[in-house]
Amino acid sequence: MDVQDLKPPKPLYLERVGFRGVRRRALLETPEGPVTLDLELDVFVDLDRSKRGVHLSRNIEAVEAVVSERRARSIEGLLRSIAKELLSRHGYAEKATVRARTRYYIDLEAAGVKGREPVDVAVTVSLTRSGGERWRVAVSVKGMTVCPSAQSTIAEAEGISDPSRAPSHSQKVLLKGTVDTGKVMVRIEDLARALLQSFSAPTFTLLKKPQEARLILEAFTRPMFVEDVVREAAWRIAAIPYIPGEALLQVEAVSLESIHPHDLVAMLRSRVSEVRSLASRSV
């Protein structure tokens, strides 16, 4: 008998045992064509109180069997296949969890500017042997905000009738949206676009001078506090029609302040149904 199969000195259930930070390159056969992703994977199974340890090599074998030998059509399909393979190889496990961190590219347009922009993504799936399935999708993006308070104060002080013509300070904002659902995974593209539309303006990798001017002018017509950004993002995510109402939503923003030595943070947690209820009452 393997040492792992012996009874443990302290018979306690372990929710997760496995590897963190397994790096693999995966090829997805998407409807838009082949996509190569560099993945950082966490692969776990649970462990019954009657067993001392997990046969950990099976975790890597499960990853290799899927990444090397199969072609998934999506990142969610890839992770689901790995989780199923984990349950198949670990007959004693009741639950498998797989998390992937990677960088995605989203087609973006704002103020007449177009670009294919990077977003950071973390996708987690948990499968149970009884058929339970849980997804968590987190997307992190960057954008800019224009301070409405400074803009309003300067407009009033300088007698500027149109506040959007008044100067203000602007800052880069780091925005992260996370949705936790049952058997429906939120599409990365949908979540990313909801977030990217929640700033005074998004950021772009390449801007020529006329594009830069248009983007800044548009941002100044939409001044936002970091609190506004978080609420706007939650509103837009809740408007994605296929997300079930029971889904858990979390939005976090960090504003890298330009005129202060410290940063600002805002965060919201809610069920999607609660946000939708407020949205319907405000129409």
Curated annotation (Swiss-Prot):
Known cofactor(s): Fe(2+)
Transmembrane segment boundaries: none
Site entry (May be catalytically important), positions: 147
Cofactor info, note text: Binds 1 Fe(2+) ion per subunit.
Entry GO MF terms: GTP cyclohydrolase I activity; GTP cyclohydrolase IV activity; iron ion binding
The protein's Enzyme Commission number: 3.5.4.39
Top-level EC class: hydrolase
InterPro entries named in the record: GTP_cyclohydrolase_FolE2/MptA, GTP_cyclohydrolase_MptA
Reaction(s) catalysed by this chain's protein: GTP + H2O = 7,8-dihydroneopterin 2',3'-cyclic phosphate + formate + diphosphate + H(+)
DNA-binding is among the record's keywords: no
Single Gene Ontology BP annotation: tetrahydromethanopterin biosynthetic process
Keywords from the named record: Hydrolase, Iron, Metal-binding
Pathway(s) annotated for this protein in UniProt: Cofactor biosynthesis; 5,6,7,8-tetrahydromethanopterin biosynthesis
PANTHER family: GTP CYCLOHYDROLASE MPTA
Family to which the UniProt record says this protein belongs: Belongs to the GTP cyclohydrolase IV family.
Quaternary assembly: Homodimer.
NCBIfam families: GTP cyclohydrolase MptA (TIGR00294)
Task performed by this protein: Converts GTP to 7,8-dihydro-D-neopterin 2',3'-cyclic phosphate, the first intermediate in the biosynthesis of coenzyme methanopterin.
Record's protein name: GTP cyclohydrolase MptA
Species the sequence originates in: Aeropyrum pernix (strain ATCC 700893 / DSM 11879 / JCM 9820 / NBRC 100138 / K1)
Gene name linked to the record: mptA
